[in-house]
């Protein structure tokens, strides 16, 4: 096995630098705003829902804030890589957006052109509609998108008092906008939905039925998708929860074909429902691993409302991966209120899960929780204490809903800093993290070999796998946040037998990427480090 070196140590050796003592992985990073965190009040009902890391490593913190009249405004804040406020963005670092009524933003994504696409819900107190807002890099609205930068769209089956909500957003290879969430059926039961819009924000009525893909639901209960990802072959995987009864749920994972129909090769006719054994299991976020497996994190609750964090791994076909964790599951019960909100897969295969741990509100005896695992689901003992870190924000409770990973592997978490008088402010914190970068050996049928690695933007890469590269093989490059950066077929590239040769995009930003090749039911991948 090739020796793996940490990125930072490797750079120090190349530069002839003196040895540097690495801070404890999982601890607050004191180089970020000197304390490791930022607390930013807008009003007293603030909450961050999403973190985006730009190519220049500036950080976008996105959520909403309730004003004095309890009306929600969408808020976007931008910070420099060192944690200080970026005064060049919006109004001294903060941009606020309102529509006719409430504007609740739950997710966001950066487009290949550097635009900031926000997704959520607008509420006029009788009905709710899908909300999309697209911003320019400086925080101004992109007036070419939708109606002056805004899309408000009803997608439900009821014509009055409908409830349409977008909880996550992704972009497919064509730049189409794919959102997931929930929408009322004709009986006012929330359905889990995936919907697709054109890059300009127009509902794509050729997708699913009138632009909406869903599954059958029970006559009672609530159902929603909370996370969505696009596979390299264009298929859509969404996770969330399915209402078995009016009060209790099971974890839900569904795969759709590119046209919005259910994929019968996945689970039971496209659907997987998973129950850990408690009365309530819900998926909050999902990520794909390099071999196409699906990781879903969320919660598992007992009938007495003890909440535990849950991480489950499914095979590419939707079966529980019994080799992961304990029979396919990692279960974390640190307190009475453990909630996993976000996942990230590191370039070395490690898994980071973040959320909240402690006692449930209204107390403030809860805070940041970060877990790190090996690729097999065992705790990474180098992280925190026994694989878990519980950083403390003095005098505040902390609820974590968002996570991002910077190019150096450091972990950003965001959400709410809560006072003892129940005032909530925007919170952004950065945690130390240690990870390895290396070219994996070609072993078995899971890995690819890439040279050179590290590379620079516009480098010519050679990628080798263990099979003959077919002309219809799909080559895809993903950023650390899961964003599809580049895709092409091998037929348009130089290739010979088991190798393809191609050039990286000239405007590719420094960072960590995953390079994948998919053909004839197989997927090979490798981590790639791009430097200046």
Q: Where on the chain are the PLM-derived regions?
A:
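Bacterial Sec-dependent N-terminal signal peptides
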Residues: 1-25
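Hydrophobic alpha-helix-in-membranes signature
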Residues: 18, 189-191, 451-453
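A composition/secondary-structure signal for short, hydrophobic, low-basic-content segments
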Residues: 18-20, 50, 448, 510
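Extracytoplasmic mature domains of secreted or surface-exposed proteins
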Residues: 22-442
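C-terminal outer-membrane/trafficking sorting elements
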Residues: 443-451, 455-532
